[in-house]
Amino acid sequence: MTKYFHFLDVATGEYFSVADESLNNAKAIAHENFADPVFCGILDEEEVDILGEDVY
């Protein structure tokens, strides 16, 4: 089941989400795309839509 892992890129102050089944995979994707991502929690699809964040 796909989850939305919520991150903050400390370097830019940008919040974003990674859609994946595994936190480890999500962290790897976050580190590939951002300089200093910090995991903040898990969101559901509705919360991601409301926030309007980029999803990777």
Regions found by a protein language model. Give the residues of each.
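Short aromatic-glycine-(Arg/Gly/Cys) micro-motifs in beta-strand/loop hairpins
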Residues: M1-E14
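Short, solvent-exposed loop/hinge segments that bridge or flank secondary-structure elements
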Residues: F16-V18
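Short, mixed-charge low-complexity intrinsically disordered segments
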Residues: H31-Y56
